[in-house]
UniProtKB/Swiss-Prot annotation:
InterPro entries: Ribosomal_uS14 (IPR001209), Ribosomal_uS14_bac/plastid (IPR023036), Ribosomal_uS14_CS (IPR018271). This is Small ribosomal subunit protein uS14c. Binds 16S rRNA, required for the assembly of 30S particles. PROSITE patterns: RIBOSOMAL_S14. It comes from Phalaenopsis aphrodite subsp. formosana.
């Protein structure tokens, strides 16, 4: 189980990303529209002055049960470890164990 402080930090990043999403998108569009390089640099400076954690690349997908940041399956929102346990216990409808 991930530490609670790490999970809270991730939630804080998600809020920041949502808050600055449209600002960042508008600045990116401006950069593509402006022909002069100096103007692009000025706009890029504005983009860089936004908080570091507002960038979507800083977000990490986590298991919603354990908070584990690795080996997550997007379809279920679970880590592979928990997914396997739930499939074995028949808690996920439609998911079956493979056998050959």
């Amino acid at each position: 189980m991930a530490r609670k402080s790490l999970i809270q930090r991730e939630k804080k990043r998600q809020k920041l990303e949502q808050k600055y999403y449209w600002i960042r998108q508008s600045l990116k569009k401006e950069i593509s529209k402006v022909p002069s390089l100096r103007e692009q640099w000025k706009i890029h400076g504005k983009l860089q002055s936004s908080p570091r954690n507002s960038a979507p690349i800083r977000l990490h997908r986590r298991c919603f049960l354990t908070g584990r940041p690795r080996a997550n399956y997007r379809d279920f929102g679970l880590s592979g470890h928990i997914l396997r346990e739930m499939v074995h216990a028949c808690l996920l409808p439609g998911a079956t164990r493979s056998s050959w």
